[in-house]
Amino acid sequence: YSSKDLKADRSFVKRVVKVGYFCKIESYTSADIKFVQGKTSSVRIEGTKSLVDNLDIKQNGETLVFTTKGRGMRIVGPARLTVYVSSPDITSVYLKGSGNFEAQSNIDTDALNVELSGSGDVDLRKVLCDNISLRLRGSGDVEAQAVDCAVANFELLGSGDLEVKMLKARNANAALRGSGDLDATLKGVADVKASLQGSGDLDLDFINCGNADIDLRGSGDVELKGTLRTLNTSKKGSGDIDRSQLRLAR
């Protein structure tokens, strides 16, 4: 298996792919996926002809799988290959490639699992769900504007950054084992458990949260800000825990 360079030609084309109901997406390509949660399931590909022709989309049950025909595809030049996708529900997104995933609408689902193993980025708007899992193993970045859920799990194993700009949840678990940074603002979260075993930095901003357990075993630094009721810390690594901007409101 080897990749080939595909230079964009001048012929811009659109292709509609007929699909049934799906709620999971897997991409192993350089294509950018733009998702909208809607009433129907649809797929539309836009790009230069050579790129569109080389993209293969198959449906395995409730999973939509994006691959390339023949050898791998690496896009050369300024052109991008874009896939516009809509579905009534989305529960899983897996990216292993240089392509990006962007949710162009809010997401309302029972559970959402997102895993990024490539160099592409994942951008989410507001997510409303019971459980969410964001896992970053690659060099790309994961960013969520707002998450409202019962249980949130964040795991960073790669060199990319993971940021959640506003999290409302009952319980939140964050684990940083890579060299990237993990930033989150948490509002009204009753119980927070966070561990740092890597070289990246962990930055948590609390807004009227309950208890937080912080475990530092790596060389990265932990910065805690905002308001908590109780805080428990454990430090065995070479990094520092900065709580100078944290207030405990008992």
Residues of each region from the PLM?
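Intrinsically disordered, low-complexity proline-rich tandem-repeat tracts
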Residues: L95, L116, L136-R137, L156, ...
